[in-house]
Amino acid sequence: MEFNKAQNIIGLRVLNDNVIWLWVKDKSVVVIDPSVHEPVIRYIDENNLHLKAILQTHHHSDHIGGTKPLIERWQNVKVIASSKEKKRIPFQNVSVEDGETLNILGEEVKIIEVLGHTSSHIAFFLNGENPVLFIGDTLFSGGCGRIFEGTYQQMYSSLERIKSLPKDTLIYCAHEYTKSNILWALNLKPKDQDLKNKLSEVEKKLSLNKLTIPFLLDEEMKINLFLRAKNLEEFTFLRANKDLWV
């Protein structure tokens, strides 16, 4: 478990590399992409919190696996997901569209459609004094999501949307993939000093059993080859190359 004091966001490590984010305000909590339920219930009970909502970025089982047990345990919980996911996230009770704005825990949260990994992936953007983006599997530190249902064009466009956000946006992705991503990037750009520095930083955090996420958009744009891609052709080459990386 890791706690971001400035944002009141807690990360629970689960499965092999998933991270479930819990956004806490006063005694209320919002859970983002609960892949499992047991550690979430434990944390909520131990801290006497009230589950208010679950945010679902997409339908993959390692993001929704814990949702049903959570809404069976607590009543009147909002399950917020894309309106395009009604069949694949059938327990959603708040269906949202791209560009829609919600009030969650007293904060304005904007829905941003980020297609590519799936055909209906969304992100949740808190545009406050300390901007936050819950991005699911669209962007990782040093990488981006595999393209399962969408197209290269959709993923490239999604990353361009992310790049247009405030540069001090703190990005919360759903997997701890950073070291592998940086090693891949260094294989392509072995002399890149920003990547070398990032690898040292990542290895230090991991040696202390700390997460390497979340990450700042401004810093990520310097080291993420997908965000640095100048056009669709370059992005397509990088994504195809990364798919072959072992």
UniProtKB/Swiss-Prot annotation:
<feature type="binding site">
    <location>
        <position position="58"/>
    </location>
    <ligand>
        <name>Zn(2+) 1</name>
    </ligand>
</feature>
<feature type="binding site">
    <location>
        <position position="117"/>
    </location>
    <ligand>
        <name>Zn(2+) 1</name>
    </ligand>
</feature>
<feature type="binding site">
    <location>
        <position position="175"/>
    </location>
    <ligand>
        <name>Zn(2+) 2</name>
    </ligand>
</feature>
<dbReference type="GO" id="GO:0019243">
    <property type="term" value="P:methylglyoxal catabolic process to D-lactate via S-lactoyl-glutathione"/>
</dbReference>
<dbReference type="InterPro" id="IPR032282">
    <property type="entry name" value="HAGH_C"/>
</dbReference>
<dbReference type="GO" id="GO:0004416">
    <property type="term" value="F:hydroxyacylglutathione hydrolase activity"/>
</dbReference>
<comment type="subunit">
    <text>Monomer.</text>
</comment>
<dbReference type="InterPro" id="IPR001279">
    <property type="entry name" value="Metallo-B-lactamas"/>
</dbReference>
<dbReference type="InterPro" id="IPR036866">
    <property type="entry name" value="RibonucZ/Hydroxyglut_hydro"/>
</dbReference>
<protein>
    <recommendedName>
        <fullName>Hydroxyacylglutathione hydrolase</fullName>
        <ecNumber>3.1.2.6</ecNumber>
    </recommendedName>
</protein>
<feature type="binding site">
    <location>
        <position position="60"/>
    </location>
    <ligand>
        <name>Zn(2+) 1</name>
    </ligand>
</feature>
<dbReference type="Pfam" id="PF16123">
    <property type="entry name" value="HAGH_C"/>
</dbReference>
<comment type="similarity">
    <text>Belongs to the metallo-beta-lactamase superfamily. Glyoxalase II family.</text>
</comment>
<feature type="binding site">
    <location>
        <position position="137"/>
    </location>
    <ligand>
        <name>Zn(2+) 1</name>
    </ligand>
</feature>
<dbReference type="GO" id="GO:0046872">
    <property type="term" value="F:metal ion binding"/>
</dbReference>
<feature type="binding site">
    <location>
        <position position="137"/>
    </location>
    <ligand>
        <name>Zn(2+) 2</name>
    </ligand>
</feature>
<comment type="pathway">
    <text>Secondary metabolite metabolism; methylglyoxal degradation; (R)-lactate from methylglyoxal: step 2/2.</text>
</comment>
<dbReference type="InterPro" id="IPR035680">
    <property type="entry name" value="Clx_II_MBL"/>
</dbReference>
<keyword id="KW-0479">Metal-binding</keyword>
<dbReference type="InterPro" id="IPR050110">
    <property type="entry name" value="Glyoxalase_II_hydrolase"/>
</dbReference>
<comment type="function">
    <text>Thiolesterase that catalyzes the hydrolysis of S-D-lactoyl-glutathione to form glutathione and D-lactic acid.</text>
</comment>
<feature type="binding site">
    <location>
        <position position="62"/>
    </location>
    <ligand>
        <name>Zn(2+) 2</name>
    </ligand>
</feature>
<dbReference type="Pfam" id="PF00753">
    <property type="entry name" value="Lactamase_B"/>
</dbReference>
<dbReference type="InterPro" id="IPR017782">
    <property type="entry name" value="Hydroxyacylglutathione_Hdrlase"/>
</dbReference>
<feature type="binding site">
    <location>
        <position position="63"/>
    </location>
    <ligand>
        <name>Zn(2+) 2</name>
    </ligand>
</feature>
<keyword id="KW-0862">Zinc</keyword>
<keyword id="KW-0378">Hydrolase</keyword>
